[in-house]
Amino acid sequence: TNIIAGLAVGMKSTFLSVILFSAAIFSAYELAGFYGVAISASAMMATTAMQLAIDAFGPIADNAGGVAEMSELEPEVRERTDILDSVGNTTAAVGKGFAIASAALTALALFAAYVTFTGIDGINIFKADVLAMLFVGGMIPVVFSALAMQSVGKAAMEMVEEVRRQFREIPGILEGKGKPEYAKCVDISTKAALKEMVLPGILTIVTPILVGLFFGAEPLGGYMAGVCVSGVMWAIFQNNSGGAWDNAKKSFEAGVEINGKMEFKGSEAHKAAVTGDTVGDPFKDTSGPSMNILIKLTCLVALVIAPILGDHDDIKISVSEKIEKNIKLKIEKESDLVHIYRFEEQ
């Protein structure tokens, strides 16, 4: 039930988050068009310093707890660091929420720039190729998350095998007399972090290029929309589920009342919470935060190849509060360095 409850918490957490930044997008657009959306995205990014401070709090408290345990300090020291670590998990989830909201706003601003550069009127989902690419885009964050979590599993198993090898071959480790080979474990995690991200990176960069070249500008716009919507949902879900599982495990240090009975560390309920935390760590630390990068990078790659896909005989620039209303510009005088345009009546 711990796994089920954690999944439910993450899924429910998407509701309020999506409602809030959907309202932010809509109000910014109604007030100032896509310029307002761009300013909103800039304002969200202006909180970067605060986000970094919030995100740094959790790892500092977690490391303090690890140092306290390895130093065999008094139990109350570990209890205090666990409380701080629980707060750190919550603040980290808040910081990640800011990051994914800014990614969504940035993606919308980049989406508007993409439509302008390609010269298309909009994204018509009644077209079969556009709808197909919308579904493909929605699938990409799911596959990306799977690859990221699979990488964590592979690296973890390699680490476990290395630790077992050291226990077998280096005498006195368990008694505290032998010196473990720490560098080997660090080497395994570092190599896995670099090597296992090659495939997700290729998936992120190459897929929008292939969609654009083989299907065109409008289906690529549908693909971008699918990645953005699906990526935001998965990011919120995974960040909050992972944080809930981690905090559930830490709460057993002080004791948790379940069905009128106090459960402590080492109980069956605590073992279930440890299992949940094993699932939650790759959720909140690996695949969840990576959705932010996936969304932004997809939109940026699409924007880079937009001039190749677009038809620039007529350049359209959205100037009103409604995206459907565009003003056409035609070249009136052309020189080597300067283009002079005149407005054409609709």
Regions found by a protein language model. Give the residues of each.
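Hydrophobic packing and interface segments
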Residues: 1-324
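Short linear regulatory motifs and low-complexity interaction segments
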Residues: 317-346
